[in-house]
Amino acid sequence: MIIKDCNIIFTDKIEKGSILIEDGKIKKINPKIEESSYIIDGSSLYLSPGFIDVHIHGAGGHDTMDGNFESINEISKVIAKHGTTSFLPTTMTCSIEDIRKSVEAIAHAKKNGTEGANVIGAHLEGPFISPEMIGAQNPEHIQKPSIDTFKEIVNDNIDAITSITLAPEIDGAKELISYLKDNNITPSMGHTKAKYNEAIEGIKCGICHSTHLFNAMTSFHHREPGVVGAIFDTDITTETISDGIHINYASLRTAYKVKGTDKVLLVTDAMMACCMPDGNYSLGGQDVIVENGAARLKNGSLAGSVLTLDAAVKNVYNNTNYPLNEVINMASLNGAKLCKVDHRKGMIKEGYDADLVLFDENINVKYTLVNGKIVYSA
């Protein structure tokens, strides 16, 4: 397959060109065009590396916590329509049995593949979080951080776990963080009431990422910088839900200036109502009302989002002064780095997986390719 005459978005520039895809890989950039090849005309379109969502609970009426392969597969198909080619199905603070069941389904999807976006691994959001920063998690199922409880949750599927969100200030967290690092799992700081010094201690133990910046964490104050201050004061990565609801765009711009775009990932934190009409849904077993693009619990707390990554890219591009290639890095390369797959995903480079998105000047997705296969065309 050849995609010809498109605007190729590299990590540092955008250039007109063509690419050859063979055996699921980017074989050559600017190849000789053979008339016998299957050709996609990319004229007036942009070719981007596929988006990578490291924090997503559901889409299209399906939830990771459904605990079955079918739901993971359906989510993968829905988000592929919006340019996502890899993702981390994200669990909630539910019972150990329910999380274990979901991890098993994620491990199955990782091993056997899906019909849409690739499953790289699981992101466990909880259950080792603070009851004081519960957000839309269920306080009944919070667990004290412990290596034994973590092992009970993942069972034989530790290799399927990519990241875990936890609160570093809670007793037992430091030992668990060290264990996670030793097992090549990314510990992320989130749903945490930590003070600045406690957050810094967690970072020293091995925390290298932070979950949905500004949301469900202690805010910045000039005398107590909190978790936000610790994120800004160190080189750990962070992620933003860039829907204009979770974070004001002025706050987004400030965060990007402080961290630099190489340290920020765009995520959706989407729940099952993503790509569905407004109405009543659930998230991790809790009732959610979706109205005017916002998902909330009955008490008013935000409950994930209905954001897609193409919309996140569009929002950031339209509300900042960053060039398109930098914004795309936030939605692709940075996620690949967190997932430790940046040697084969996250950029357009010869030898890399042909996980690609073609979109127009308004960032409307026209084609999505996963491993060189067209999984969506408008």
For each predicted feature, which ranges?
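N-terminal metal-binding scaffold of metallo-dependent hydrolase/deaminase domains
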Residues: 1-34, 369, 374
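C-terminal cap of metal-dependent C-N hydrolases
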Residues: 6, 337, 348-378
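Alpha-helical scaffold segments that flank or form the walls of functional sites
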Residues: 46, 54, 64-117, 141-156, ...
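Divalent metal-dependent hydrolysis catalytic cores, especially in the metallo-beta-lactamase
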Residues: 57, 73-102, 117-130, 157-169, ...
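Active-site gating loops and adjacent loop-to-helix segments of metal-dependent hydrolytic enzymes
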Residues: 77-88, 130-158, 200-213, 227-237, ...
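Active-site core of metal-dependent hydrolases
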Residues: 155-276
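His/Asp/Glu-enriched, well-ordered alpha-helical/loop segment
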Residues: 227-240, 256-268, 274-358
